[in-house]
Amino acid sequence: MENFNLMAEGFDTDKRLDRAKIIANKIKSHIVDGHKKTAMEYGCGTGLVGLQLEDVFNKLLLVDSSAEMINQVKLKLSKHNNPNIKAYCCDLMVNAPELHHVDYIFLSLVMHHIMNTKEFLCRLHSLLNDSGRLLVVDIDSEDGGFHAKYPDFQGHNGYEHSYLTDLAAEAGFRKSAVETFYHDIKMFNGQESPYSLFIFEAVK
């Protein structure tokens, strides 16, 4: 398994930065009246995606279960004063102090690490205001090559679109839509593993 506390300090590679810019722009294209809204990014890591959206929302909460990832976020925040951004270290499946009543929740390459997807979607649903929106960027179903570097990876090898749509309905979301928008290749031990990313939007 990836140890995100150990990965935090060197997490911001050029590859991740480039991909995060594309993801942030895609998420931004789904935001309506963001300047009036409160948003939360869960699994924010070092803030690669979320901090690119800091001017989009009225208030932004950056949340991660890794203390070291949040330390990296706080270090970045200390270098430019934006009182509308707050960073929290917590596991949403255990506790979520001060995180209720948000208009948007967005996640990038996070959900496939969480075993019980339906339970997680139910939890996110409970944190949204009525008509709030969930935006999930994650991996299309693949053969496991994305995590080939981690042989004991215990999450999901991506998702089928129809599976997520059905789970979202079961979790209480009124409507949802999904589209693939990004294609790339991961290399490990000289082996190429093509993968693609989708954005999934669900409305409470």
Would you name each region that the model predicts?
Residues 109-110:
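Short catalytic micro-motifs in class I SAM-dependent methyltransferases
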